[in-house]
């Protein structure tokens, strides 16, 4: 079966990357940011109630296997759609990934532009950021979110950065614990100084 052969090749690559990183720099965390749909229910009853491109079947990426085997240290699925998307609803996918984290740290990849361009279906006077943040925080298996793309946050599109600073990330956060790698607290920071690049960040 050609599809199985392709998946096997990708699996070998991910496993070898994991083993090499552990052997050379064991403190380095190796994560993946896969496409947001693992499998649709029409391909697998355990898949999500979606209708789109699939990691497993179309991209030959068995992300759940990598997490289950411990070949990746964290997972950031790219759930760039809006709440209410007909083929790939954000809420459906967040719930699906939250229940399929395979005991590895899970963060949600979130599109800044898509979030600010779509109104909250329950409150059309605001964008979807408040509801998306509430959804993520409703699951203990979700450790946070990653914003795509960074310059949209820096440029404060739709006052997105302002909302993060004043509402959702107003307090310093602890570094997520990866106790399957080690359980030692990081050492004290020494000789830290602020350095600005020509880009300003």
Regions found by a protein language model. Name each.
Residues 1-13, 85-91, 158, 163-165:
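Active-site cleft segment of glycoside hydrolase catalytic domains centered on the general acid/base Glu
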Residues 77, 147-150:
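Conserved beta-strand positions
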Residues 1-71, 80:
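Polysaccharide-binding and catalytic clefts of secreted carbohydrate-active enzymes
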Residues 27-51, 79, 93-132:
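Active-site clefts of carbohydrate-active enzymes
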């Amino acid at each position: 079966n050609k599809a199985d052969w392709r998946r096997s090749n990708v699996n070998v690559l991910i496993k070898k990357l994991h083993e090499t990183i552990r052997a050379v720099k064991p403190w380095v965390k190796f994560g993946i940011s896969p496409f947001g749909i693992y499998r649709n229910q029409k391909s697998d009853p355990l898949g999500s109630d979606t209708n789109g491109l699939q990691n497993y079947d179309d991209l030959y990426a068995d992300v759940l296997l990598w997490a289950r085997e411990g070949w990746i240290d964290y997972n950031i699925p790219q759930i760039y759609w809006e709440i209410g998307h007909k083929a790939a609803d954000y809420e459906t996918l967040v719930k699906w990934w939250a229940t399929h984290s395979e005991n590895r740290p899970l963060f949600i990849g979130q599109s800044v532009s898509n979030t600010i361009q779509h109104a909250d279906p329950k409150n059309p006077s605001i964008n979807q950021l408040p509801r998306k943040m509430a959804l993520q925080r409703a699951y203990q298996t979700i450790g946070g979110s990653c914003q795509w793309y960074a310059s949209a946050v820096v440029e404060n599109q739709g006052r997105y950065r302002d909302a993060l600073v004043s509402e959702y990330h107003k307090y310093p956060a602890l570094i997520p614990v990866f106790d399957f790698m080690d359980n030692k607290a990081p050492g004290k920071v020494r000789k830290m100084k602020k350095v600005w690049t020509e880009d300003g960040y």
